[in-house]
Amino acid sequence: MISPEAEKIMNERFGKDSIIALATVDDGMPAVRNVNAYYDSGSFYIITYALSDKMRQIENNRNVAVCGEWFTARGTAENIGYFCSDENKETATKLTAAFSEWINNGHNDFSDKNNIILIVKLDTAVLFSMRTRYDIDFSD
């Protein structure tokens, strides 16, 4: 369980448009890339393309790692579906607000159903803030 203090730091640091590194596995080798992500309640949310290499890698192995700004974590990734689907309306609204500076700049074609939301559900993490180390277990 994450402590209230660590959750506050996570929300301050990542509860907005944040760049994090997302690591997947490709043929037994790590593959890492930076992604825009938004943190909420123990998970990162990422808008991506369903046919990308990262999604192909996640289909083969859902175990991932992330890191950014004095934070590292392991978790599992899942395609939760088309960005504009009725099921994702609440999440899409949060992501639209978080990514407001760039979401409608033409990079995303939301008429294409391959524009999906990737959720990274965090398992364990290490967070550093103000000379304090937080070892976090996100399980309930």
Where are these regions (language model features)?
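Extreme N-terminal tail/first-helix region
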Residues: 1-16
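Short low-complexity stretches enriched in small and charged residues
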Residues: 1-4, 23-36, 72-84
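Short amphipathic alpha-helical segments
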Residues: 2-6, 50, 87
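Short Pro/Gly-enriched beta-strand edge/turn motifs at strand-loop
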Residues: 15-21, 98-103
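Short, basic and Ser/Thr-rich N-terminal targeting/leader segments
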Residues: 16-18, 31-33, 111-114, 121
